[in-house]
Amino acid sequence: QEKQAQIEKKPGRFFEDQPDVNDDFQIHFIYLLAKNTKDKERDLNGWIEKEVKKIDDTFFKMTGDKQRLKFDYREDGKLDISFARMDRKAKSGGWNVSYPDYYLQKQGFNNPKKLYFSFTDAASGDGGQMGPHHGYLFIGRASGQITKISIHELLHGNGFAMPCTKGVRDGAHLGVGILSQELSLKFGKAVYEHNDPTCPDLKDSVYLIPTSDDPFDPLQIACALGQKKRNNPPGNYEIPARYTHKKLLKGRKNEWCTYKLTEYASEMWFKDWKK
């Protein structure tokens, strides 16, 4: 492990979040490998920047050229991309509220004002997974649909579909648009500019720019609901008072947020993740 860490120290590679240009909410990218995954240097060779540019431009088009996602940039103006290698092997199934979330938070990727989106060459069986505030894009499985799957996952990272989103089904999905199986490049009226002030609208997320005059933080909503259903994470979280929709306040059976996992999880939970 030590030897591998030395080999992986390459010029231009950052193992931690670099100083922020401002104190705003932002999406931070990570090139994540499992214990024995081959390092394809996607954080160094421009691959991640290229994919993020496609995500950014497509998202902008989907909003009707109104808003973009807020990304984390370094002081030199470049996209801030970190590198992380887990000390365990990849495993199929859910990575959220599981060892990868736990490991990355232990490495310091635990700022409540960030969404962490990891591009990984390891595999889980899915194309992507995300919730507030960690997410994963599994490059091999997502191949050919990376932009679509990334936007789909980043919507989950922003809390969508919400329990009150019209037509929500199969957890946090919809029957049509980017949050459906078809992954078509439209949000659908239920998600963006839906005109129901009692239920969150994507246009008001703190992770969009220009930012709404009355924005919401998806972590607050997801963690408040997680506490209600699972009694965790620890801390105080509030759903903004203006969101009075009964379905939102009640939540679904399975509500969670990935925040503060290291504060209540024990290593024993992750014994299926082989060292």
Where are these regions (language model features)?
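Hydrophobic alpha-helical positions that pack around
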Residues: 127-133
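Catalytic Zn2+-binding segment of zinc metalloproteases
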Residues: 153-168
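Propeptide-to-catalytic entry region of secreted or membrane-anchored zinc metalloproteases
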Residues: 2-115, 119-127, 142-145, 162-163, ...
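Short pre-active-site segment immediately N-terminal to the catalytic Zn-binding motif
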Residues: 137-151
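An active-site-proximal "capping" alpha-helix that borders the catalytic cofactor pocket
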Residues: 55, 175, 179
